[in-house]
């Protein structure tokens, strides 16, 4: 009779046989009696046997131990791998008591009425989008008010604008944007208003107060940040200073700031290419009122926009009209005043800009599903005015604007419109740097941030997009080095946070709910825009967007929490929790699907995906670590036969695995039959048989210490990653009736699915191969490539795998962006599975080591922590 191991109290050499192949001696030092874990010093006669397993049978217990040098632990077969590889996995982070304690008590039904109201109001905003809504510009209104009556009388042609100036002086004596103070904006608007009032000999009190404000602040302008200087300020401000002198206004003309601006203007005037000034539309058209002494107004008329304006600027158009009497200029100004009544904005129309930004906002805030028709109408409008030579902020704007172009390319491509990126070449100089307008050298953080976002929807071979990505990353990293980088054109409160997020999480690491959560925290309902003057755009910056986004996020999160509770109950009842193959990772796995396929109507898809993933992870561990060859053979046979007849021959842990899989698959198949209208059990069983064949092959490699060829490994990885299996089961519950054509676009036959699997496997391997190698697994992309290229170092092989993954991701993006005949949810399930893998393996194994990576915080923010 064998002596029980727990009775050993001193050194005893034990010799045993490992499956008839190796005779090994173990020197056992037992620290205590009759405890479930022992410490053993192991020696082996064969270095090749260091990672083999010793199977010591003591009574009815199975005791196994790794063979190798040093100390190890000894316990039952469910704790130690039968192939001799032990994996220490940290306990689950989200235990019931922890997750329940931080789950929200939010009740979605309490918000239903308010959500309905907000959706209706935002839909109304979309429907009301005409030529663009924007706030008044005191500066431009002052220029329009200067136009004399056409009948020759000593009155303004637009007297209502003069009245607006008189009635809209701010309390400090200035004019300008009242919600945000910028000295540049206030001085420029105030100077324009006091000049106009003086011209019409009215408003002496307002003029006096305006002069006092000007004198007070002009002396401090040397300390004002240049990045708040409006477009064309260095041209229009000195020109108005000269006019103020001619009107004998008592202003501090000798202050250093005014002298510097005048000198700067003189230098820039000499640099203006007069030969092209009248032939090519440029941003000079936006501020012609500051260039009257050098331009020929009659010649400049040929660059007038179809709507009669000069680059949508009322001030510039008013100046040209006063110089030429051009009737189209007057028609434009009449058109603007019919729209706004007694004032004008700093630029109008803004129809393309407004629509693109409104679509971008609702999408990034995660509320776009409520506005499908409105989004399509807006994008159809933009696309109908799309010009491959470039577009600006308005349909008839002759000067391309990189912010609009980059945002337009990105959004239109994501919605399957065919647009080229070639126009971006016109914004690039000879050094590969990109700027705001063609041929100019100004740019801002927002411009470069939107260009960076655009570069991530590049197709393979689009050189200009690759150059844009490199350029913008350089620029944005440099911007972050500033203590408080403020964008010259878009005065956002949280621009730093947006830049940091974009650089850390590029598009292929960005899951929809994480994007939503981040943007909710950074969206500014009161953000101010800076063009020629500061202004706000109510259809772009509106608290309704943010309020709806917060309510919607918390409502969806509450739904997800209920689903998670049900999944945790299932996890416990399945028996998986007792196996110790994998600590509780229900929350992390549910997060991976809920952060992408988040819509309430996809609840069954999320549950099915989570259960299937947990089955996959458990079975991967069983095949890879915990099961013997005989165990695996028995399990495969049971799955193929799909009945209970083999259960009596199975050890408990195998029986638990089979019963859990059996019940899950049958449950899914029954629900799938209702969704698809026919029996889907054979389809699902076939997927699992293919998956388990792949696991079996990798287990055989591991036992034989076989390193396959790189090609063989990559081909096997397309299945062993399990992503196709999970997608092809989950897609049954996306609300689509699956035809063979749809399946052919996302199953093993498709390049789309293959690239999803390949990139997922490579992301996994790059972060886990060292740990897996340390426990005896010899097959990974890195090791297989090194076997075929022995002259390479490990670092060089790893670098190659990263390049391979980047190229595959580029191809994968193209497949996603160009696939038109696959339903949206089906496409998203494939695409976001790949993105999820890129995020989860960004820092390491985000599933197994979630407590050490940012995955823990991501899970908390998406599943447990409501937005305030």
Swiss-Prot record:
Q: What's a BP term from Gene Ontology annotated to this protein?
A: diterpenoid biosynthetic process
Q: What is its EC number?
A: 4.2.3.147
Residues binding Mg(2+) 1 = 620, 624
Gene Ontology molecular function terms on file: magnesium ion binding; terpene synthase activity
Q: In which pathway does it act?
A: Terpene metabolism; oleoresin biosynthesis
Any keyword Metal-binding?
Answer: yes
Q: What does this protein do?
A: Involved in defensive oleoresin formation in conifers in response to insect attack or other injury. Involved in diterpene (C20) olefins biosynthesis. Monofunctional enzyme lacking the DXDD motif in the class II active site relevant for the cyclization of geranylgeranyl diphosphate (GGPP). Requires (+)-copalyl diphosphate ((+)-CPP) as substrate, but no activity with GGPP or ent-CPP. Pimaradiene is the major products of the enzyme.
Mind telling me what this protein is named? Monofunctional pimaradiene synthase
From the UniProt record, report the name of the gene that encodes this protein: TPS-mPim1
């Amino acid at each position: 009779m064998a002596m029980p191991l727990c009775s050993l109290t001193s050194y005893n050499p034990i010799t045993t046989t490992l499956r008839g192949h190796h005779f090994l001696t173990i020197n056992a030092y037992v620290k205590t009696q009759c405890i479930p874990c022992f410490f053993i010093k192991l020696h082996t006669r064969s270095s090749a046997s260091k990672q083999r397993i010793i199977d010591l049978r003591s009574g009815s217990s199975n005791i196994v131990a790794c063979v190798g040098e040093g100390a190890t632990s000894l316990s039952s077969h469910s704790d130690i791998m039968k192939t001799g590889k032990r994996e220490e996995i940290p306990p689950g982070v989200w235990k019931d008591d922890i997750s329940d304690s931080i789950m929200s008590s939010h009740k979605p039904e309490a918000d239903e009425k308010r959500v309905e109201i907000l959706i209706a109001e935002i839909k109304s905003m979309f429907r009301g989008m005409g030529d663009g809504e924007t706030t008044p510009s005191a500066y431009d209104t002052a220029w329009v008010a200067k136009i004399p009556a056409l009948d020759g009388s000593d009155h303004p042609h637009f007297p209502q604008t003069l009245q607006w100036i008189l009635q809209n002086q701010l309390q400090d004596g200035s004019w300008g944007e009242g919600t945000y103070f910028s000295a540049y904006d206030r001085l420029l608007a105030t100077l324009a208003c006091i000049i106009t009032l003086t011209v019409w000999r009215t408003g002496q009190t307002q003029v006096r107060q305006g002069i006092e404000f000007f004198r007070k602040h002009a002396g401090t302008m040397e300390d004002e940040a240049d990045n708040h200087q409006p477009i064309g300020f260095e041209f229009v401000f000195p020109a108005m200073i000269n006019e103020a002198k001619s009107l004998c206004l008592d202003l501090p003309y000798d202050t250093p700031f005014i002298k510097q601006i005048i000198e700067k203007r003189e230098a820039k005037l000499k640099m203006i290419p007069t030969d092209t000034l009248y032939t090519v539309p440029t941003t000079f058209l936006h501020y012609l009122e500051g260039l009257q002494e050098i331009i020929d107004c009659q010649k400049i008329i040929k660059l007038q926009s179809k709507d009669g304006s000069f680059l949508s600027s009322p001030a510039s158009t008013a100046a040209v009209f006063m110089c030429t009497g051009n009737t189209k200029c007057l028609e434009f100004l009449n058109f603007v005043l019919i729209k706004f009544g007694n004032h004008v904005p700093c630029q109008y129309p803004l129809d393309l800009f407004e629509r693109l930004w409104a679509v971008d906002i609702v999408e990034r805030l995660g509320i776009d599903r409520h506005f499908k028709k409105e989004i399509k109408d807006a994008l159809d409008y933009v696309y109908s005015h799309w010009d491959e030579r470039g577009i600006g902020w308005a349909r008839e704007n002759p000067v391309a604007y990189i912010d609009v172009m980059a945002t337009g390319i990105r959004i239109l491509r994501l919605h399957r419109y065919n647009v080229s990126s070639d126009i971006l070449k016109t914004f690039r100089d000879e050094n590969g740097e990109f700027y705001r307008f063609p041929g100019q050298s100004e740019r801002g953080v927002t411009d470069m941030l939107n260009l960076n976002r655009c570069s991530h929807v590049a197709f393979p071979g689009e050189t200009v997009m690759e150059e844009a990505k490199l350029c913008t990353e350089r620029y944005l990293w440099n911007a972050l080095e500033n203590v408080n980088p403020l964008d010259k054109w878009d005065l956002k409160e949280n621009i730093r946070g947006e830049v940091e997020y974009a650089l850390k999480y590029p598009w292929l690491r960005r899951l929809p709910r994480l994007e939503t959560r981040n943007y909710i925290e950074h969206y500014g309902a009161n953000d101010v825009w800076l063009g020629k003057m500061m202004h706000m755009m109510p259809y772009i910056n509106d608290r309704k967007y943010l309020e709806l986004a917060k309510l919607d996020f918390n409502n969806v999160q509450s739904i997800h929490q209920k689903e998670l509770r049900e999944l945790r109950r299932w996890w416990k009842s399945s028996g998986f929790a007792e196996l110790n193959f994998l600590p509780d990772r229900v929350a992390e796995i549910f997060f991976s699907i809920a952060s992408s396929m988040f819509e309430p109507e996809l609840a069954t898809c999320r549950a099915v995906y989570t259960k299937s993933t947990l089955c996959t992870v458990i079975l991967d561990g069983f095949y890879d670590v915990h099961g013997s060859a005989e165990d695996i053979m028995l399990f495969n046979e049971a799955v193929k036969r799909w009945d209970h007849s083999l259960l009596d021959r199975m050890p408990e842990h195998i029986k638990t695995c089979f019963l859990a899989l059996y019940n899950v698959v049958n449950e899914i198949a029954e629900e799938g039959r209702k969704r698809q209208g026919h029996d889907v059990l054979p389809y699902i069983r076939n997927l699992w048989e293919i998956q388990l064949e792949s696991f079996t092959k990798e287990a055989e490699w591991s036992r034989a210490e076989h390193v396959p060829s790189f090609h063989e490994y990559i081909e096997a990885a397309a299945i062993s990653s399990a992503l196709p299996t999970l997608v092809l089961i989950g897609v049954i519950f996306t609300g689509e009736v699956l035809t063979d054509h749809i399946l052919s676009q996302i199953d093993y036959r498709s390049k789309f699915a293959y690239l999803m699997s390949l990139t997922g496997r490579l992301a996994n391997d790059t972060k886990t191969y060292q740990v897996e190698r340390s426990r005896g697994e010899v097959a990974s992309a890195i090791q297989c490539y090194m076997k075929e290229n022995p002259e390479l170092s490990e670092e060089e092989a790893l670098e190659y795998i990263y390049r391979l993954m980047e190229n595959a991701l580029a191809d994968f993006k193209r497949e996603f962006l160009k696939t038109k005949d696959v339903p949206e949810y089906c496409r998203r399930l494939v695409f976001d599975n790949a993105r999820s893998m890129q995020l989860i393996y960004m820092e390491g194994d985000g599933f197994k080591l979630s407590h050490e990576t940012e995955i823990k915080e991501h899970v908390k923010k998406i599943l447990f922590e409501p937005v305030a």
